[in-house]
Curated annotation (Swiss-Prot):
<comment type="function">
    <text>Catalyzes the hydrolysis of N-succinyl-L,L-diaminopimelic acid (SDAP), forming succinate and LL-2,6-diaminopimelate (DAP), an intermediate involved in the bacterial biosynthesis of lysine and meso-diaminopimelic acid, an essential component of bacterial cell walls.</text>
</comment>
<keyword id="KW-0378">Hydrolase</keyword>
<dbReference type="GO" id="GO:0008270">
    <property type="term" value="F:zinc ion binding"/>
</dbReference>
<feature type="active site" description="Proton acceptor">
    <location>
        <position position="141"/>
    </location>
</feature>
<dbReference type="GO" id="GO:0008777">
    <property type="term" value="F:acetylornithine deacetylase activity"/>
</dbReference>
<dbReference type="InterPro" id="IPR001261">
    <property type="entry name" value="ArgE/DapE_CS"/>
</dbReference>
<feature type="active site">
    <location>
        <position position="76"/>
    </location>
</feature>
<dbReference type="GO" id="GO:0050897">
    <property type="term" value="F:cobalt ion binding"/>
</dbReference>
<keyword id="KW-0862">Zinc</keyword>
<feature type="binding site">
    <location>
        <position position="107"/>
    </location>
    <ligand>
        <name>Zn(2+) 1</name>
    </ligand>
</feature>
<dbReference type="GO" id="GO:0009089">
    <property type="term" value="P:lysine biosynthetic process via diaminopimelate"/>
</dbReference>
<keyword id="KW-0220">Diaminopimelate biosynthesis</keyword>
<comment type="similarity">
    <text>Belongs to the peptidase M20A family. DapE subfamily.</text>
</comment>
<dbReference type="InterPro" id="IPR005941">
    <property type="entry name" value="DapE_proteobac"/>
</dbReference>
<dbReference type="InterPro" id="IPR036264">
    <property type="entry name" value="Bact_exopeptidase_dim_dom"/>
</dbReference>
<protein>
    <recommendedName>
        <fullName>Succinyl-diaminopimelate desuccinylase</fullName>
        <ecNumber>3.5.1.18</ecNumber>
    </recommendedName>
</protein>
<dbReference type="GO" id="GO:0009014">
    <property type="term" value="F:succinyl-diaminopimelate desuccinylase activity"/>
</dbReference>
Length: 395
């Protein structure tokens, strides 16, 4: 029986599946076909949520005993955009100039392809691992993340699955393979502010109440002063205004309502609850100060709505896990990786509730872009790093 030891061949099989969230597109079927020859027991649970599309997921395990290492990731990808803008079709896995092109090449079908190849090589050399390896793979990472990893973890844990450590194969490297490992993630909190005024003619402002004035003052309060100066492990907390809207196409009408949305990426100075309280306090103070509203004495009238699912900040302090991966990277590439908490959120935010988790994959420079691509040499290098990591972890 031929084992899936070639990462490029594995990746081509996955890229050719049009698995744009939430469509499975054949990607999990292709992955299952790779894992079965390795002796994996495979389940494909489908999860549902009212108002969301059903999503198929995959959980596979090789081995029965501990220690138990989880590899986590996703086969779903973002849409390719204008396919005519691609040099090579986004779902063809064409190779040119020593690089494979395709949506998901680095985010993150490439990471999955390499870990499968690494495990296959490890089993060829060492036989059944002294413990267990599992794959926790979702089709809902690039979407709302409602019917994906969060439910797959609950499902597996309810069946008695327990993990000692997890590795997520997201594209963590900035410029060169081996330059960065993610050992934590900032938290993420989103909200929407709505201000209510009174519509009127711009030539008669005393007869109206322009909510845009109050909105400017409230947004200033969110932007200044800085929330903090950063910590030993995280950069400073950062708030960005993401939308501002008054729903008013006319230039001579004062709007009746104004809204703004924001997102905060926060460090370990804050919890979700303490940050929400700080934002509420800032808005309440700014509303009471009543700046930028001449002739108005009543406070600004506003509503604050928390959006989406907040993600708490986390930091993995498992010295063995981090040291084993860092040593494996250095042994293969000669580089000492930076241990970082930068970047956006990932499904590691769910996994950290079950076991220590770190992230390491390919270079992310072309992820989500037209002509997403990966050098074939990087696929081989990452496979060798993963294989060395498996050898060291189970030694």
């Amino acid at each position: 029986m031929t084992l899936p030891t070639d990462p490029a061949q594995n990746l081509a099989s996955l890229i050719r599946c049009r698995s744009v969230t939430p469509v499975e597109g054949g990607a999990l079927t292709a992955l299952e076909a790779m894992l079965r020859p390795l002796g994996a027991r495979v389940d494909r649970p489908v999860f549902s949520e009212e108002g969301e599309a059903d999503v198929e997921n995959l959980y596979a395990r090789i081995g029965k005993d501990g220690p138990h290492l989880m590899f986590a990731g996703h086969t779903d990808v973002v849409p390719p955009g204008d396919e005519d803008a691609w040099t090579h079709p986004p779902f063809a896995a064409e190779i040119a100039g020593g690089e494979m092109f395709g949506r998901g090449a680095v985010d993150m079908k490439g990471g999955i392809a390499c870990f499968v190849a690494a495990l296959a090589r490890h089993l060829e050399v060492s036989g059944t691992p002294k413990g267990s390896v599992s794959f926790l793979i979702t089709g809902d990472e690039e979407g709302p993340s409602v019917n994906g990893s969060v439910k797959l973890l609950e499902w597996a844990a309810a069946r008695g699955e327990r993990w000692d450590a997890a590795l997520v194969g997201e594209p963590t490297n900035v410029e060169t393979l081996g330059d960065m490992v993610k050992i934590g993630r900032r938290g993420s909190l989103s909200g929407r502010i709505t201000l209510f005024g009174r519509q009127g003619h711009v030539a008669y402002p005393h007869l109206a109440d322009n909510p845009s004035r109050g909105l400017v003052a409230l947004l200033e309060a969110l932007m200044e002063p800085a929330f903090d100066q950063g910590t030993a492990d995280f950069p400073p907390t950062n708030l960005e205004i993401t939308t501002i809207d008054v729903g008013n196409p006319s230039v001579n009408v004062i709007p009746a309502r104004a809204t703004a949305a924001f997102n905060v990426r926060f460090n370990d100075t804050w919890s979700v609850e303490t940050l929400q309280a700080e934002i509420h306090n800032r808005l309440d103070r700014a509303a009471a100060e009543n700046r930028l509203r001449p002739g108005r004495t009543e406070p600004v009238s506003f509503e604050l709505e928390w959006r989406d699912r907040p993600s708490p900040v986390f930091l993995t302090r498992d010295d063995k896990l981090v040291a084993t991966l860092a040593a494996s990277i250095e042994a293969v590439t000669g580089r000492k990786p930076q241990l970082s908490t930068t970047g956006g959120t990932s499904d590691a935010r769910f996994i950290k509730d079950y076991c220590p988790v770190i992230e390491f994959g390919l270079v992310g420079q072309t992820m989500h872009m037209v002509d997403e691509k990966v050098p074939l040499s990087d696929l081989e290098t990452l496979t060798r790093i993963y294989q060395r990591f498996l050898e060291n972890w189970f030694s």
